[in-house]
């Protein structure tokens, strides 16, 4: 499958800071806090100089507008990890300057929409948040799965900040619900037999959370009935 860029992009300023075409297919998304209430244009501007030795695939400005800094086909320099960035779409999001590096609703809503778009174009129906570094980095996603990772797992940083970190489960649930992976997947309980408890909850939890919003049935009740 060929690589494409998001149609949500309204501004493009390509950075020279990248490693060329990826050596791994896209199966991760890594959202970051840019540490500043920057515009979409300013985020790209941070990465135009080769002396910076950093970049990202997309930026989300403080008003929610999306910019393209490194084409999706190319590996950006964003997460302090070659292995992660080879397979992840990296997104720098406008945020406050200090912990918890909060993001406004326009930025968060755009992040949800951008993740939905990235998953759709890359053939994914489920976005997973496992919430644990070792489990995530050792997890082999199914062909229709995308996994969230964070910069703090690869460097001594707070990124993406505690504000977004606490909402990554919600991000995964919203994206998975929009992708419709739950009702059409035909998932059976037996498909979870080789997963740890944390992996099983991460895989099916967002599906039942999304179902709760439409049916009113508590997610824990639906999950218990499923298992």
Residue ranges of model-derived segments:
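N-terminal capping segments
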Residues: 184-227
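N-terminal catalytic cores of peptidoglycan-degrading enzymes
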Residues: 1-85
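Cell-envelope and extracellular/periplasmic
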Residues: 35, 72, 82-100, 116-120, ...
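Solvent-exposed, acidic/flexible segments
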Residues: 24, 84, 100-108, 197, ...
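Basic/polar, cationic surfaces and motifs that engage anionic cell-wall
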Residues: 2-11, 18-23, 97-191, 195
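Hydrophobic "anchor" residues on beta-strands that sit immediately upstream
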Residues: 28, 88, 147
């Amino acid at each position: 499958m060929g690589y494409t860029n998001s149609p949500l992009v309204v501004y493009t300023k390509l950075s020279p800071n990248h490693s060329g075409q990826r050596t791994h297919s896209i199966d991760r998304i890594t959202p970051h806090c840019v540490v500043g209430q920057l515009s979409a244009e300013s985020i790209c501007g941070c990465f135009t100089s080769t002396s910076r030795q950093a970049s990202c695939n997309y930026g989300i400005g403080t008003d929610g507008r999306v910019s393209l800094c490194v084409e999706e086909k190319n590996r950006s320099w964003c997460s302090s990890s070659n292995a992660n960035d080879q397979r992840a779409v990296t997104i720098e999001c406008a945020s406050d300057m200090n912990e918890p590096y909060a993001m406004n609703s326009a930025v968060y809503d755009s992040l949800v929409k951008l993740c939905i778009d990235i998953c759709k174009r890359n053939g994914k129906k489920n976005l997973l948040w496992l919430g644990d570094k070792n489990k995530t980095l050792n997890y082999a996603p199914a062909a229709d799965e995308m996994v969230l990772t964070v910069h703090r797992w690869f460097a001594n940083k707070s990124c993406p900040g505690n504000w977004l970190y606490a909402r990554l489960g919600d991000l995964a649930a919203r994206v998975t619900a929009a992708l419709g992976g739950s009702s059409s997947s035909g998932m059976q309980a037996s498909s979870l037999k080789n997963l740890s408890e944390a992996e099983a909850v991460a895989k099916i939890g967002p599906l039942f959370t999304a179902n709760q919003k439409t049916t009113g049935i508590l997610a824990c009740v639906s999950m218990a009935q499923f298992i």
